[in-house]
Curated annotation (Swiss-Prot):
Its main location: cytoplasm. GO terms for cellular component: signal recognition particle. It comes from Methanosarcina mazei (strain ATCC BAA-159 / DSM 3647 / Goe1 / Go1 / JCM 11833 / OCM 88) (Methanosarcina frisia). Belongs to the SRP19 family. Involved in targeting and insertion of nascent membrane proteins into the cytoplasmic membrane. Binds directly to 7S RNA and mediates binding of the 54 kDa subunit of the SRP. GO terms for molecular function: 7S RNA binding. Keywords: Cytoplasm, Ribonucleoprotein, RNA-binding, Signal recognition particle. InterPro entries: Signal_recog_particle_SRP19, SRP19-like_sf, SRP19_arc-type. The lineage of its organism: Archaea, Methanobacteriati, Methanobacteriota, Stenosarchaea group, Methanomicrobia. This is Signal recognition particle 19 kDa protein. It comes from the Archaea. The keyword Cytoplasm applies. It is found in: Cytoplasm.
């Protein structure tokens, strides 16, 4: 059952190693390599999005890989929230965050 007011963030959405057709929804410049559920959860927590982790779920485009997913508060467009989460993970990893253009 779908939770009202929640967005689903799959690791594939922000994974730099995935193509757009494989599920990535943000640019390669803003995405990160192989994001983990715990990193997504921590970044969403820092952004005040009240994350809920569901580790047993599999992304429909790659149903054979159990990657898990994170439910976050719906505070705007999914692509914007995914980008914010990816940039927060980059900061946590100590990577350079691209300048706004």
């Amino acid at each position: 059952m779908k939770d009202k007011g929640k967005l689903v963030i799959w690791p594939a959405y922000i994974d730099q190693t995935k193509s757009r057709s494989s599920g990535r929804i943000i640019s390669r410049k803003n995405s990160i390599k192989e994001p983990h559920l715990n990193e997504i959860k921590e970044a969403a927590r820092q952004l005040g999005l009240n994350p809920e982790v569901e580790p047993e779920k599999a992304y429909p485009k790659s149903w054979w890989e159990v990657s898990g997913r994170v439910l976050v508060d719906d505070n705007g467009p999914k692509s914007v929230i995914a980008k914010q989460i990816a940039l927060a993970i980059k900061k946590m990893r100590g990577q350079e965050v691209p300048a706004k253009t």
